[in-house]
Amino acid sequence: MARPAAVRVLWALLLPLLLGSARGLRNASQRTFTIDYSHNRFLKDGQPFRYISGSIHYSRVPRFYWKDRLLKMKMAGLNAIQTYVPWNFHEPQPGQYQFSGEQDVEYFIKLAHELGLLVILRPGPYICAEWDMGGLPAWLLLKESIILRSSDPDYLAAVDKWLGVLLPKMKPLLYQNGGPIITMQVENEYGSYFTCDYDYLRFLQKLFHHHLGNDVLLFTTDGANEKFLQCGALQGLYATVDFGPGANITAAFQIQRKSEPKGPLVNSEFYTGWLDHWGQPHSTVRTEVVASSLHDILAHGANVNLYMFIGGTNFAYWNGANMPYQAQPTSYDYDAPLSEAGDLTEKYFALREVIRKFEKVPEGFIPPSTPKFAYGKVALKKLKTVEEALNVLCPPGPINSLYPLTFIQVKQYFGFVMYRTTLPQDCSDPTPLSSPLSGVHDRAYVSVDGVPQGVMERSNVITLNITGKAGATLDLLVENMGRVNYGRYINDFKGLISNLTLGSSILTNWMIFPLNTEDAVRSHLGGWHGPNNGRHDKTFAHRSSNYTLPAFYMGNFSIPSGIPDLPQDTFIQFPGWTKGQVWINGFNLGRYWPARGPQMTLFVPRHILVTSTPNTIMVLELEHAPCGDSGPEVCTVEFVDRPVIGAPPTPGHPPPDLSHRDLRLDYV
């Protein structure tokens, strides 16, 4: 009889544990996020819930600073954050997926969860976001006739494969599975796109449910305009709207009610500022206007996401563009409550006070703005021209083609390609080099036998007079300035996308060099000495003093010793420089263009700086450097402790009419 007694004792010990486990499972299964249609609200775990969210794009904020920015958002009174997942950020080449380091979206979402923030996820596949090609990978254009954002079989196959990788990673992070993701957006402002393909939306809806389950809350977002909701909304996807300050809030939500007669009011993008373009004024929206409008939205009982709460930076080549072609700058500051560098602003505290009137705001310490340091001027010397460095920039050598090939055709998705041919005739008198179909996408830096001739620019300068002898080498260094991210023109091919003519003759027999600038910069282009491609041993007298050959410049600087808490964030500016790209310690900070503005400084986050060895700066100046050739041997860049992103527009680039904010809508 000892055996049954032992069993009874063991059972007595195990029973509380088993009951506890059962309660835990039941509690996990009780985590729900649903819509209460009878009371026009969300329910979180069965209780009424309203989210006040802010947009942060993990792809625009260094991982080093994710926690700092998220904490500041929480302390502002937000209970959720919203983020996009840019497909091209994670799948740069077909089948090559990147989910670590800066691309670790799972870690970002888990970090938000640890800090007590819910997550509204917008995985696309198209995201807009002023991001290159709206987040769609450029390699989709390998099929030139592909119809993006539609039921095109090739497009759907790529989407199916991509979301088949991404969504299973997101499933454990759904709220009902113990994670922070409460809702997930399908596509993005689809009603603003010309295809209006309901079969495409149904395909996405089924795909999301297949990977995430049927209890996931899916939604759409469109402009507060009835025509947008006609194509953007679909039964089974909760329709929300977006609009900015100054809009008629009652009228905007009445538009939502035409698609969703019952359910919570939601503004998925309440604009705290606006985007910028090169050559136009920095966009700002007055704090009191944003605060007043937010107050009215919350007074309506609506849910809201503040787009952006922090804008961040378009590092490297990630910026997008709008039509008629205007590229966005490196800074995505957006005049948001947190600045590009994560600094607290007047707008931050004003919006926090508005939120405090409606919801409990966390008490306690708000992480301060990060300290900035002015490291001063750094001398740079000319390293090599692009032409001299071709063997390092393009180790496999050129691709030969009778007619020009696009970036896509040579599988160069970002950066630069050198196009080379010879002049078929003497051009002793200035002779027009033309792109009759405006086929230079986006800027071409033109030289003949090493003599700069000028710049051709998409939709702006399509003809350039050049001189040279028959048989002379004609070089065009073509820059991809960022793909269109909004509207019907997102199939944005780069490079020479149509033939060039010299006089009346079509130019043929091209040598095409796709440039691997990232690897070349990391190797310092092979150092100061090396072959110069065998053609130009001397500096030539330039046809125009306005231009020098595109060239790399390099310098070093050390972080001062004896000062605590260094390195610190800083900003780099380019006095006397014109336009180009800059790297620090191999990290591609992005584009500078002080000749056009409005952005004059680039944000330098401290985590890319080192204290143990000198820091290396590499600059690719495309148009005119303030040193080298006929100028001084050394030129400088300068590190300052304040940003300048709102310089006046340059002559020839008048400010736009911003009387209505969504200028993009004219080009859907």
UniProtKB/Swiss-Prot annotation:
Residues of the signal peptide: 1-24
Bridged cysteine pairs (disulfide): 196-231, 627-635
Enzyme class: hydrolase
An example Gene Ontology biological process: carbohydrate metabolic process
Annotated compartments: Lysosome
Reactions catalysed, as given in the entry: Hydrolysis of terminal non-reducing beta-D-galactose residues in beta-D-galactosides
Residues making up the propeptide: 25-29
GO molecular function, a single term: protein homodimerization activity
EC number: 3.2.1.23
Gene3D superfamilies according to UniProt: Galactose-binding domain-like, Glycosidases
Keywords per UniProt: Disulfide bond, Glycoprotein, Glycosidase, Hydrolase, Lysosome, Signal
Similarity comment: family membership: Belongs to the glycosyl hydrolase 35 family.
Presence of the UniProt keyword Disulfide bond in the record: yes
Gene field: GLB1
Matching PROSITE patterns: GLYCOSYL_HYDROL_F35
Active site: 189 (proton donor), 269 (nucleophile)
InterPro entries, per the entry: B-gal_1-like, BetaGal1-like_ABD1, BetaGal_gal-bd, Galactose-bd-like_sf, Gly_Hdrlase_35_cat, Glyco_hydro_35_CS, Glycoside_Hdrlase_35, Glycoside_hydrolase_SF
Main location per the UniProt record: other
Name the UniProt record assigns to this protein: Beta-galactosidase
GO cellular component, one term: extracellular space
Source species: Canis lupus familiaris (Dog)
Assembly and oligomerization: Homodimer. May form higher multimers.
